[in-house]
């Protein structure tokens, strides 16, 4: 009888310990924030390793349970996100609203849900890497920018894929040769995207 009592006590202690551990996991889950975060001078692009704020134009970020990945451009964010292994991470994506920000220095107070944004491609506005996709919360603001530049187009998040990014990069950088990336020391238009 004493053996059976010890066995039941051990089983009870193991179950109690398991419940305590399970409860700790719930608290940790509740503390995870998926809100956008500010960009800082020492942030490196997750894709290319360049300093994120050294370049003009909208930036992107992917906020996950385990942290934040930052990107020097919206195109770099899409390049990362469109990889099959990254799409399953359930990251929340954010981009700057260029309807509320200056092109040369986007305002981190105006980071918006990238999946709800409208993107303008085909403008001469320079960004960090590859195609410059100007991001907007408001479709009308995006259409106003596109109307200012012949050949520019407005597309929603779900219409951007790898082929679209490649075509946009080729159209924007057609004559730049192998070094298709503008350098941070080059002069850029100092006007706002809106």
Where are these regions (language model features)?
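Post-signal-peptide N-terminal segment of Sec-exported extracytoplasmic proteins
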Residues: 37-70, 74-78
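Bacterial lipoprotein signal-peptidase II cleavage site
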Residues: 25-32
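C-terminal motif of bacterial Sec signal peptides marking the signal peptidase cleavage site
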Residues: 20-23
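Short functional micro-motifs and their immediate structural scaffolds
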Residues: 29, 53, 154
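Thiol/selenol-based redox catalytic cores and closely related redox-interacting motifs
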Residues: 91-157
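Short active-site loop/helix that positions an aromatic residue
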Residues: 76-84, 145-147
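Bacterial N-terminal signal peptides that target proteins for export
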Residues: 2-13
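Histidine-centered metal-binding segments
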Residues: 172-194
């Amino acid at each position: 009888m004493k053996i059976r009592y010890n066995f039941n006590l051990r089983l009870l202690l193991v179950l109690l310990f398991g419940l305590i551990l399970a409860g700790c996991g719930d608290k940790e889950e509740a503390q995870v924030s998926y809100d956008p975060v500010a960009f800082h001078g020492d942030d490196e692009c997750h894709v290319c390793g360049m300093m994120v704020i050294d370049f003009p134009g909208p930036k992107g970020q992917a906020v996950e349970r385990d942290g934040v990945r930052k990107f020097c451009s919206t195109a770099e964010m899409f390049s990362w996100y469109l990889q099959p292994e990254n799409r399953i991470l359930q990251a929340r994506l954010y981009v700057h609203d260029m309807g509320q920000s200056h092109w040369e220095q986007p305002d981190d107070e105006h980071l918006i849900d990238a999946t709800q944004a409208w993107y303008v491609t085909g403008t001469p506005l320079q960004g960090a890497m590859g195609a410059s996709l100007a991001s907007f919360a408001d479709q009308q603001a995006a259409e106003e920018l596109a109307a200012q530049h012949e050949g520019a187009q407005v597309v929603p998040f779900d219409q951007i894929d790898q082929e679209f990014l490649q075509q946009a990069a080729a159209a924007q950088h057609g004559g730049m040769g192998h070094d298709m990336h503008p350098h941070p020391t080059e002069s850029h238009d100092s006007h706002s995207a809106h």
